Amino acid sequence: PSFMDLVEKHFNESITFGNELKPDYVLDQAASQASGDNTNPQVNFAQADALLKYCGENQIPVRGHTLVWHSQTPDWFFKENFSDDGDWVDKDTMLKRMENYIKNVMEGLATQYPDVEFYAWDVVNEAWLDDGNPRKAGSSKSEDSNSSAWVRIFGDNSFIEYAFQYARKYAPKNCKLYYNDFNEYMPGKTTAIYNMAMELKEKGLIDGIGMQSHLDVGFPTASTYRKAIDKFASTGLDIQVTELDITTSD
């Protein structure tokens, strides 16, 4: 059998694109500037087209990954006139951009790829540091990987709730919405994710937590990992292992 035959036989329940639906693959700078609307970023699915068509033709559901992330999100998305050298926009402008971006992604996919079922979306990805604090104010070009342009604009992690509000508003009816993160078993991060998830759950905005689970045979211990799972499960939300890999020290 061919490689694709094996995919269709053994991995036909779900596919997550590694990069093709991330902001820097989907956002279209030239079209955004040409639109004349400073609050309406345009999107283009050209780089995801082959995968989307494949999933539609083979009836393989897709987990959307990801909408709001500090990484692989171009700085021009946060700047005046969608320009690389523009000034950083204010919070109100960025909220409008966030809503229109999520709207354009959801509606564009539904219109252009009606045969593709998006059963889930990672709405926000990796917003908390290991100690449970928000990322630092920065940009996608910062040498500090702990920095975020979202935090630069909003001052904190308040953008998370807005992202889930807009995703809930525009996502397909039965699509589940997730928060996704790595090192989710670090105590400070576990607590931050738990508290955030409970607040979002009370408002009906979140359906589950994605545990990336980039593990090593030496860390975390099984009991540490289990403790995080139990903590997240106590929210009553769906818990999914989303990016599992286990490395060895040798």
Region spans (language model):
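Short amphipathic alpha-helical segments and helix-helix/interface helices
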Residues: 4, 49-52, 164, 197, ...
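Glycine-enriched alpha-helix->loop->beta-strand junction motifs that scaffold or abut catalytic
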Residues: 11-15, 205-206, 235-238
